[in-house]
Amino acid sequence: MADFDAIVVGAGLAGSVAAYELAKAGKEVLMVERGNFAGAKNMTGGRLYAHSLKKVFPDFEKEAPLERKICHERISLMTSDSNFTIDFSSDAMEDESQASYSVLRGPFDQWLASKAEDAGAEAIYGIPVESLIRDESGKVCGIKAGEDEITAEVVILCDGVNSLLAQEAVVYSKPPASQIAVGVKEVFELDEQTIDDRLLCNPGEGAAWLFAGDATHGVFGGGFMYTNRTSISLGVVAGIQACASTANATPVYQMLEDLKKHPAVAPLIKGAKVVEHSGHMVPEGGINIMPPLIGDGVMLAGDSAMMCINLGYMVRGMDYAIAAGQMAGQQAVKALDAGDTSKAGLQGYVDALEQSFVLKDLRQYKDEPAFMENFDRMFNGYPVMVRDIMNSMFVVDGSPVTPMKRNVMPIVKRMGIMNILKDVRGAMKAL
């Protein structure tokens, strides 16, 4: 007889929700986390689209450690000496059914893990899982952690993008470097009123701000800023291969240092104290690098299943992880009740994902990673073009005024009208 009905590896969003669903159904479930606490090994820019969480915990707003409701969307094209920003807000963004929030993964993940434990899940922290155990038929039947072997009817892997256990469990090729990015982030402590004033936010409301161009020194990637209640999260994500293949590429940590000094950013964090520094690998390939989601006795969810998309204007992953964790937990319960946790018995998980927004979204944007990877002009050409156009419009030096088209067309032609049309066509196809 197995030690547990289910073992969940990883106490992140997918793992804690999967463990919660299993425990709520009365199953014996063990959640194993290599960090000393839930969230210790997790990093995010900081934005949670809350629709998935609301399906698990309808009243989460009353108890979850949320930072601010995001009510401002800002997107910037940057050069070293300029910044062009679109700032959007609407009543729809404040609607509870469509709300998103900034979060800090440490406190948020601990709260979510506590919900699983309160439901009856057992959790152990500070324990890395070294490998999986298989029975004589090859079915996954547990984990090995140090000298201990712990068995279960089903194992759910939610241990992140660089999951060696996932590669062991379902045997797939490691994602190419072109489909993986690395992110670094710092959290700057400021008082609540100062953040409201500097970011032009009402109390309790916040901004999500994405930067393209000089934020990554012209290579594939971008910068981000999220307002927390009493801090600002600022970071950079850059493609690993783009950095490695670019001559004299700037290290990612230096990109962040330079972003902090940019004229558009420096005043916002002036006088702030750095209270956190973190790094994380980010899956950028979407469904193109997604491994098999099930095997005999095993399921994958969250980053270990590469459930993430970066559209340039929007980054999503946490809502996918929560939804996948919920479906993994629910389908594991059904498989346990049916007495069949083979690959065939776990097929319901894949079917549920196929019918959900998770795989529908990832399939919809299957061409986007390749488009963004080769969209060099977004990270170097267009920021310069926009800067020059804006300068031609707003800089007054006493010279006679010339028609706008005479100022703008030479700038556009330097970029190449056919190049612009090609990029628009590619964006329409990919997005």
Indicate where each model-derived feature is located.
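Active-site-proximal substrate-binding core of FAD-dependent oxidoreductases
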Residues: 308, 327-378
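Conserved Rossmann-like nucleotide-cofactor binding loop
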Residues: 14, 37, 162
